[in-house]
Each structure stands twice: as structure tokens, then as C-alpha cells.
Amino acid sequence: MSDPEIALALVGFGNVGRRFLRLLDEAADRLDFRWRLVAISTRRHGNVVDPAGIDPARAIRTVEAGGSLAGRDTTRQERSGIDVIRQVTESLADEAADGQLVVIETTVLDIDDGEPATAHVRASLEGQAHVVTTNKAPVAFAYDDLEGLAETVDRVFFFEGAVMDGVPVFNLVRETMPAVFVDGFRGVLNTTCQYILSQMERGVSLDAAIADMQARGITEADPSLDIDGWDAAAKTAALVNVLMGGAITPHDVTRSGIRDMDETEVRDALTHGRRIRLIASATRHGGRLETRVEPELIDASDPLATLGPTENALYLHTDLLGDIGIVQRSSSLTQTAYAILSDLTQISRRLREL
């Protein structure tokens, strides 16, 4: 059987989206599918749709040079992501019907209501496209609705890159833990806060630690979502919704960040053999879920206390296997891009089985 060809439409074309296209090229001899790029939708660089195929390298060069993908066609410049999704699902209706169209959603998290990412996923599924996203919002705000829609239209909604980059959290449970009940979890899920707290243990102020990360290009210009605990809350909601059958949003998570922490108290904890970490957790009490993101003072013997400045970890509490630990030693664009590739490979295998 020849390798299936998958048409790819990218909604969002920032660092992750561009790294993903480069990864496809770098891993070409390891892929079990063929692909062509048929659409790109961006917020700042316009949009382009071409069912015959778009040159990925040229698109990357254009965006990184600050140019517009739309060229001189201002109508393409002004269209929304939803408009592009609808155009591509209509113009490639035959491929969508055959399950060979995939929309890859990599826009940034909007913590208020999860839009427009959630609408992007919904419109893609309604157009019979499979969806892969690295955005936490659709999973954290509308997982049940979107997963139900995916089942109705016989398409997949994958999101391995939404939590811990490319580390296979969701695939681990879905593919290798049949009949196992996840009744809670606890982890360090935000690299920015982990790095800042590690620096504060050395006497560096929060503001100086943030400035250092920004200078290194490893945090956003505005790190509020990280230091106020919203990023970890969105990841907590996503994990609860998928692994524990919850139906919550990030706003349901009891949350406090590290904005008001002082380097003195962080150093004092270390002096007394303890450490402060931003911990995300979920526990089930009968029929009630308790979810939290907050700085915790933990003993040096706690596995989460041993994590380095750029390390994350998640411990799943299960009924049959006890506690299962997943540790991420570092995070990078390549790992997030790999999560998309991993999900695409799952879709390719599905096509081979048809």
C-alpha cells in the first residue's frame, strides 16, 4: 500500500508552526505519509489557500522577513481563521470526505474564553477535517463538546502538544493504560515559574529572573499567564477533562501564582531543607473534583523538589498501577512540533486501516 497523502492547513504560523514544517522536512525519510501544505492563516502576515500546494520554505522565509503571505490580495489579508478553514474544507471537500485533510491549530492561548481556538477546532470538524492542536484552550474549555463532535463526524481531535510539549501524556493513557482509572494528579507544569523559582533560590528577584528569561528568548514579552498561574490552570483543566472525565474550565481551578513571592522566602525555604514549587493538582473526593494551582512548600524528599530549573513533571494517581511519573528534562519548540508530528502519524495509521 502506498503512503497516504495528507493535506495540511495551518491556523497559526508562529514559532511552533514554522518549526513543525521544518521538522517535516528534516524527518522526511522517517514519515509513513506524504503531505502537502494547502493553507496558512496568520494574525499578522495574512492568509493563503492553494489546494494545489504551497511552498513551505517560501512561506517560512516570507513570514520571518516580516512579509505578507497574501501578497497584494488584500481580501486574503483580512480573512479570519474561520474564513480560511471554511474555504479550505469546501475547496478540498473530497479529501475532507476521505479523511485526508488535517487542520493544525497553533494559535496562542486566550484565557478569557478559549476563543478563537475553540471555534477553529469546531469549524474544522464541522468541515470533516481531522484536527491537531497545541493550544490548551479547546481542551480546557470545551473538550466534551469537541470530542463529541469529532465522534459524530468520525474524525479525530488530537492535542498531545497542549500539555508538556511532546511528552506523550494523553497518548500514554489512551494507548497503553486500558481499564486504568486516573483519580488524580500532581505536578509542576509551567517551565517559566520553575525557572524563576530556581533563580530566586539563588537570591535573584522575580523581576530580574523574568528579564533573564526574556533576554534568553525563553518566555513571552508578557509572562502574566505564567506567573499568575493561568497557564498551569489551563493545563490542569485539560488534564482533568481528558483523563478524569471532568467538565471544567481554567476558571474553575483554585489558582494563585508566584507574582507576589519574594526571593527571601524562597531562599529561606531552601535553607531549611524545603523548596517552593508551583504545583498543579487534582483530586477526587467522592463525586467532587478539587483542582488547584498554587505555590507549595514541599520537603526535599518530594520528587517534585528534585526538578531542575527547566524541568517539569507530572505524577498520575491511578487505581491499578499506583503512581506513574512523567518527567520532562527540558522543553523546546522541537518537542512541541514533534507532538504535532506524533498526532499526524496516528492519523496516517488510521488512514492505512481504512
Question: PLM features: what roles do these ranges have?
Answer:
Residues 1-126:
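N-terminal glycine-/serine-/threonine-rich beta1-alpha1-beta2 phosphate-ribose binding loop
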Residues 108-127, 134-165, 170-173:
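Rossmann-fold NAD(P)-binding glycine/threonine-rich loop
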Residues 184-186, 212, 218-223, 281-283, ...:
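Catalytic, metal-anchored helix/loop core of enzyme active sites in primary metabolism
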Residues 151-219, 230:
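Rossmann-like NAD(P)H-binding beta-loop-alpha module
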Residues 131, 157-158, 220, 276:
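Hydrophobic beta-strand scaffold residues
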Residues 199, 210-306:
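Substrate-binding/catalytic subdomain of NAD(P)-dependent oxidoreductase enzymes
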Residues 40, 102-105, 132-134, 157-161, ...:
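General beta-strand structural signal in soluble alpha/beta enzymes
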